């Protein structure tokens, strides 16, 4: 089997801006998350593995909320004089998937049109329990993306519990072997 050498971080940084690096990862992770969400059996959306766990539908809604959070952080910032809140979850996974995809496209467009100097501007966000701090926008962008990856991991466990087929994420799964 042939392998190709990946460029070193220094080589990448010389040709790809931090904004472009983020967008490439953002698109790749979005495509993977969409595969996982679409694989979930619609008739099992209320699956709740534990009393303290969210239902699958509520967990999927986090992806939509985070796109709104990211768009707001990059365009307007937050008004912390009002308690944070989100809209209630959509009634079904199909709507959630559609809203997540729409939100992703809006955020990708915002990021694509940002200048690199805007990435170091800060946004007020939580840095510890009940503690706000200034976070560079680029760091906030990566934090949200990493949080989505975390929730996708949770959702993939729900998917297995719902007897769905877990698609490849970073490698083969029992349902999608690579060899």
Where are these regions (language model features)?
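Soluble or luminal CAZymes and related metallo-dependent hydrolases
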Residues: 18, 25-29, 99-103
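Short, contiguous alpha-helical
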Residues: 2-5, 9, 23-27, 31-37, ...
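Short, solvent-exposed, charged loop/turn and helix-capping segments
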Residues: 40-43, 116-117
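Helix-adjacent hinge/juxtasegments
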Residues: 72-115
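Acidic catalytic patch
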Residues: 113-128
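Active-site rim elements
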Residues: 18-23, 90-97, 141-145
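Short, low-complexity N-terminal intrinsically disordered segments enriched in polar/charged residues
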Residues: 10-20
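Solvent-exposed, charged/polar functional surfaces in cytosolic regulatory/catalytic domains
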Residues: 32-35, 39, 102, 106-113, ...
């Amino acid at each position: 089997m042939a392998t190709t050498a990946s460029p070193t971080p220094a080589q990448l940084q010389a040709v790809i801006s931090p904004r472009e690096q983020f967008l490439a990862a953002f698109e790749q992770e979005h495509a993977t998350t969409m595969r996982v969400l679409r694989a979930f059996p619609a008739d099992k959306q209320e699956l709740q593995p534990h009393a303290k766990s969210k239902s699958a539908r509520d967990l999927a809604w986090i992806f939509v909320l985070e796109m709104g959070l990211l768009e707001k952080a990059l365009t307007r910032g937050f008004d912390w004089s009002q308690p944070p809140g989100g809209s209630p979850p959509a009634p079904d996974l199909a709507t959630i998937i559609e809203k997540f995809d729409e939100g992703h496209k809006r955020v990708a467009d915002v990021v694509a049109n940002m200048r690199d100097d805007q990435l170091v501007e800060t946004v007020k966000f939580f840095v510890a329990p009940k503690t706000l701090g200034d976070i560079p926008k680029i760091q906030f962008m990566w934090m949200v993306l990493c949080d989505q990856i975390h929730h996708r991991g949770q959702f993939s466990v729900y998917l297995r519990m719902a007897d769905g087929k877990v698609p490849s994420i970073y490698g083969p799964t029992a349902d999608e072997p690579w060899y």
